[in-house]
Structures are given as structure tokens and as C-alpha cells.
UniProtKB/Swiss-Prot annotation:
It is found in: Plastid, Chloroplast thylakoid membrane. Belongs to the complex I 23 kDa subunit family. This is NAD(P)H-quinone oxidoreductase subunit I, chloroplastic. Disulfide bonds: none annotated. It catalyses: a plastoquinone + NADH + (n+1) H(+)(in) = a plastoquinol + NAD(+) + n H(+)(out); a plastoquinone + NADPH + (n+1) H(+)(in) = a plastoquinol + NADP(+) + n H(+)(out).
């Protein structure tokens, strides 16, 4: 055939292909128009975390036997355990325990391998501060239980996100 006719046929095929792609994109856009928004208004609305959420670590001073298993299983050797050997009873006495949450990767190994269950993960995830040194928690700060989001009347809790159907 003539070169002009073949170029015109290619142009027609490309136009049809482009229109099909635009139509497919428009259909995807229309399918998303019926969904609820996923964004929540953070300080006023908060999600209820799942049962297995790994938040701030809670520490119970009385249960700790200063075995330092948490330090050995931590990938970054983060917990600082200070203890003194009591010679009369031949046992370790815990003096100080601290974790720097600015460095912690929240892997949960310390909680999982603790033989006395003195460590546990809480649902607290709001650890932001203006000074990074405030993220170094000692045994007193680690022993504080977090305030439950459900009990706070100023915050609207969202129990689950709307399910996205494909």
C-alpha cells in the first residue's frame, strides 16, 4: 500500500489504544470515588491498635532478676542493666534499668525472651519529644502504665478502618 495509508492506519490504532488506556484509568478513578476516606484526623481521632502491636516497653522492677537476657537478645544491645551482687544471699540485686527509645527498633526480643515476664509491650506509640535525651527512660518511666485511649473523652476512637474491596 501507499506509505500515507499505512501511517494513517497506525495513527488510528494508536488513537484507539490511547482512548482505551484513558478509559481504563477513568474506571479506576470512578471505583475509588465510592470508598470512604482512609485519612483520620490524628490528634482528635486515634486508631485502636491491634492486640499484637509493639509499642513502648513496660517494665516491672520487682519481677526483674537482673539476668541480662534482654541485653543479650537485643540486636543493638540496648537495655542498660545495672546490678550489684549481694554476697550474703548470693543473688544479684537490680539497681537501675533503662532503655533509650530513640535507638530502640521495637523488635520485641527482650519481651519474648524475658524469663520472669517483667517486660511487656504497651499500646503507647506517642513518644515524640523535642529533645532526644527525653527518650531515655529509666525504671520509673518504664514502670508507668500508659493512659488508655478508650477512656479519654476528648479523643474519638476509631476501632477499625473501612475495608477496601478490590
Amino acid at each position: 500500500m501507499f506509505p500515507m495509508v499505512t501511517e494513517f492506519m497506525n495513527y488510528g490504532q494508536q488513537t484507539i489504544r490511547a482512548a482505551r488506556y484513558i478509559g481504563q484509568g477513568f474506571m479506576i478513578t470512578l471505583s475509588h470515588a465510592n470508598r470512604l476516606p482512609v485519612t483520620i484526623q490524628y490528634p482528635y481521632e486515634k486508631l485502636i491498635t491491634s492486640e499484637r502491636f509493639r509499642g513502648r516497653i513496660h517494665f516491672e522492677f520487682d519481677k526483674c532478676i537482673a539476668c541480662e537476657v534482654c541485653v543479650r537478645v537485643c540486636p543493638i544491645d540496648l537495655p542498660v542493666v545495672d546490678w550489684k551482687l549481694e554476697t550474703d544471699i548470693r543473688k544479684k540485686r537490680l539497681l537501675n534499668y533503662s532503655i533509650d527509645f530513640g535507638i530502640c527498633i521495637f523488635c520485641g526480643n527482650c519481651v519474648e525472651y524475658c524469663p520472669t515476664n517483667c517486660l511487656s509491650m504497651t499500646e503507647e506509640y506517642e513518644l515524640s519529644t523535642y529533645d532526644r535525651h527525653e527518650l531515655n527512660y529509666n525504671q520509673i518511666a518504664l514502670g508507668r502504665l500508659p493512659m488508655s485511649i478508650i477512656d479519654d473523652y476528648t479523643i474519638r476512637t476509631i476501632f477499625n478502618l473501612p475495608e477496601i474491596k478490590p
